[in-house]
Amino acid sequence: MMTGTTLILEPVMDSKDELVKQHAKVAEDAVAGWEKAENEVVELKQKLEDAADKNIVLEDRVSHLDGALKECVRQLRQFRDEQEKNIQAAVTESTKELHSANTGLEKRVLELQKEAEAAKSENMMLRREFLTQREDLEIVMIERDLSTQAAETASKQHLDIIKKLAKLEAECRKLRILAKTSSSLSSNQSVDSHSDGGRERVEGSCSDSWASSAFISELDQIKNEKGGNRSLQGTTSSTEIDLMDDFLEMERLVALPTETQAKNSKDGYELSLMEKLEKIQAEKDDLEREVKCCREAEKRLSLEIEAVVGDKMELEDMLKRVEAEKAELKTSFDVLKDKYQESRVCFQEVDTKLEKLQAEKDELDSEVICCKEAEKRFSLELEAVVGDKIEMEDELEKMEAEKAELKISFDVIKDQYQESRVCFQEVEMKLEAMKRELKLANESKTQAESRVTRMEAEVRKERIVSDGLKEKCETFEEELRREIEEKTMIKREKVEPKIKQEDIATAAGKFADCQKTIASLGKQLQSLATLEEFLIDTASIPGSARSVHNKEALLGKDPHECIKTINGRSLEFLAIQNSNNKTSPPCSSSSDSTTVSLIMSSNRGSSEKNRNGFATVFTRSRNSVNLGI
């Protein structure tokens, strides 16, 4: 009987648990949605409050800005008037100063231009003079070079002539010696007279030659000096040609053999020799005159060179002075140019200052315009903010109305959804429970009957044990009374304190143990009473495991009440037995104690533990009966 009812009720309990879980989930979802809606409403209220605060702040700000804008406009007008006055005063003063400075600078520029033109013309004149003097100096230098070249050539020719004269004198001596050997005594006398005269001439010529050689040495010393004459070239060249002809003729005569000389007449020969000597003497005189002329020309050229050098030095000094004046004029011109540029820069600075003042004036005008535009913009923004505030209030009212409507519709939908879900789940659970019960009914029928009989026998044993426990409890109570009386007597007699304290402690411990045993016995008695009631109730239920029709009839009744009563009694029974096991007195033996525990699995609906979700197991030990569902 009991097993049948448990098999019937367990799927119902499982289905109800699942329904409870689903309802709990739905309720949690509904609560979460409701909380979410409330949070949204709170957020909207907060936004509305923020918007109202912002509106108030904006109104205060607009009023403050309006006052500040008026003050700014007033200060701006005052500042603009003062600025215009200052600008006009500064412009008039600067124009006056600029006009005076401009006139002074123009005068100074004109003076400087005149001075520059005069310096330029003077510089041109000095440059022309310098060029002419430079050309004259170049001409003088060319003439000096030519004169030096002519003097050098003349000195060379003079040296050649002196050498030729020495050679001629030596030839003459040879001829004289030959003439002396070949001539007669008479002729020797005449020739000696002539030769003495010739010797005198030759000695004079030798003295002249020595003088000419000294003159040549002097010419060599002053070779590097400046001077010369162009007219000497033709004369020296002609004399040189004549001397060369005479020299060649004398060599020819010397080269003639002595036989031809003997054949010629001695007188003619001597006469020819005398003529040649006279010619040579004449040429020598001419050469001496030419040498004198060359010396005079050289002296004249040296004087001219000295004069030219002095003129050159004067011209160089003049050129230096002119260059110094030119540099001074250039520096003065540069200074004037710098002053002109400085004045020009001053003009530009004044122009820039005027432009800056004009720009500042324009900026102030633009700022005034901007302030006016800002005032207009602020007024428009204020109007827009007021309009936004009104719109937000309207939207808030609409949102509150929509919120109320949504709340109502949400409640209706929630109720409908819960009802439909409950109905659907009940139908599914009934179908599943019926299927599981059909499978488990035949299997657990015999086991339930045998276990019920065993439980009845054990309940009888428990009743006997409970009677014994009652008797023990009564005996314990009597002992406690006696101990209390003894303690009171001990207090009256005032025994030693140590014995007194030990007796009190032992008596208190025994008293506590007795109280515990009394409480445990009372709980065991209550559990036995509940177990008897449970067995009576199960025995009164008809055997529904034999037919499906009876099971359906049982399910058609209110199964919730059955589950509640069974669960309540079983749980009370479990609590009593657990407390009895915990508070069992130490004086009672373990063989006399009995425990009945009911263990229910927490994961009843899990598929991992059992496919059907139920497992009914009855185990019986030596001293206890365990019921596991």
Curated annotation (Swiss-Prot):
Pfam families: FPP. GO terms for cellular component: cytoplasmic vesicle. Belongs to the FPP family. It is found in: Vesicle. It comes from Arabidopsis thaliana (Mouse-ear cress). Its main location: other. Residues 193-203 have a biased composition (Basic and acidic residues). Residues 186-205 are annotated as: Disordered. Keywords: Coiled coil. Accumulates in preferentially xylem cells. This is Filament-like plant protein 2. Residues 34-61, 102-171, 270-493 form a coiled coil. Ensures, when in complex with FPP3/VETH1 and COG2, the correct secondary cell wall (SCW) deposition pattern by recruiting exocyst components to cortical microtubules in xylem cells during secondary cell wall deposition by recruiting EXO70A1. Interacts with WPP/MAF proteins. Binds to COG2; this interaction promotes the association between cortical microtubules and EXO70A1. One of its GO terms (biological process) is regulation of exocyst localization.
